[in-house]
Each structure stands twice: as structure tokens, then as C-alpha cells.
């Protein structure tokens, strides 16, 4: 890890988003809460929050950051689900990796919970796709 001891402790915020493309039937099942494994949206939100807290354990060069706020929102769209994660902390380094981790794990949780409905006759996933994972914004505030 790099030495951040000389940096000021300031408010850090990062927002990351990502998308999972799903079959229309699967989206309908999610909306109607008909997924056998449970409430997809609630489970993915919790998974994202837990993942953000574990980022430093997953990424070898990440600092353990005392996170003060994590929010994972999931929006149902026509062709899939969009995940938006917001993370905040007062610390010496940014929280982009925590926001990206929250988003990524929420998306993987969605895939895991709906994979039964996404497979074709041969057990493949011809439509399912995770994409557009990115940092939407990053704030470093001295105020």
C-alpha cells in the first residue's frame, strides 16, 4: 500500500453504477417477487453494503477505510437492472473502490439469484450481461 499518512482527513464521496441485462420474463418475476431464492433487490442491496465494508480484504493494495455511509439503489429498467452505489467517509484516501465493489457485488448477487431463469435450453446465458460499471462521480471536500 502507499503511504497516505501525510494526507489530510477530508470528506470523500464516490458514486458508482453498473447494469445487468436480463430477460423480460426475469425482470417481471423480480418485480412480482416470484424469484425462488427470495427478494432480489433487498438481497442485492445488503450484499453491496457488506461488500463495500470488505473492499480492503478483497483488493490487496486498498486501505481499510472507516466508512460512514453506504447506499445501494437498484432501478428496474426495460432491459435489466441498474445499480447505483454511494459511499462516504472522512479519510485520507478516496472511496471509489468501495463504491465500485458495492456495485459489482450487488450485480453479481442479482445474477446469482436469477440465473435459473436466465439460462437457455443448453444451460448457457445468451442474453445476461453485466456492463457499464464505472465511477459516476468522486468528491473530495475540505469544507
UniProtKB/Swiss-Prot annotation:
Substrate binds at residues 61-63, 97-98. Homohexamer; trimer of dimers. This is Probable cyclic pyranopterin monophosphate synthase. NCBIfam families: moaC, PRK12343.1. Belongs to the MoaC family. Its EC number is 4.6.1.17. The keyword tRNA-binding does not apply. Pfam families: MoaC (PF01967). Keywords: Lyase, Molybdenum cofactor biosynthesis. It catalyses: (8S)-3',8-cyclo-7,8-dihydroguanosine 5'-triphosphate = cyclic pyranopterin phosphate + diphosphate. Pathway: Cofactor biosynthesis; molybdopterin biosynthesis. GO terms for biological process: Mo-molybdopterin cofactor biosynthetic process. Catalyzes the conversion of (8S)-3',8-cyclo-7,8-dihydroguanosine 5'-triphosphate to cyclic pyranopterin monophosphate (cPMP).
Amino acid at each position: 500500500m502507499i503511504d497516505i499518512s501525510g494526507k489530510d482527513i477530508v470528506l470523500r464521496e464516490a458514486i458508482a453504477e453498473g447494469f445487468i441485462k436480463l430477460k423480460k420474463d426475469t425482470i417481471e418475476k423480480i418485480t412480482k417477487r416470484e424469484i425462488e431464492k427470495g427478494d432480489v433487490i433487498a438481497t442485492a442491496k445488503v450484499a453491496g453494503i457488506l461488500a463495500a465494508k470488505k473492499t480492503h480484504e478483497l483488493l490487496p493494495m486498498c486501505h481499510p477505510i472507516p466508512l460512514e455511509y453506504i447506499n445501494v439503489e437498484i432501478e428496474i429498467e426495460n432491459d435489466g437492472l441498474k445499480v447505483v452505489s454511494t459511499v462516504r467517509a472522512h479519510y485520507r484516501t478516496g472511496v471509489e473502490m468501495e463504491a465500485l465493489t458495492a456495485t459489482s457485488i450487488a450485480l453479481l448477487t442479482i445474477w446469482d439469484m436469477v440465473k435459473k431463469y436466465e439460462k437457455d435450453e443448453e444451460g448457457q446465458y445468451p442474453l445476461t450481461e453485466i456492463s457499464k460499471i464505472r465511477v459516476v462521480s468522486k468528491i473530495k471536500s475540505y469544507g
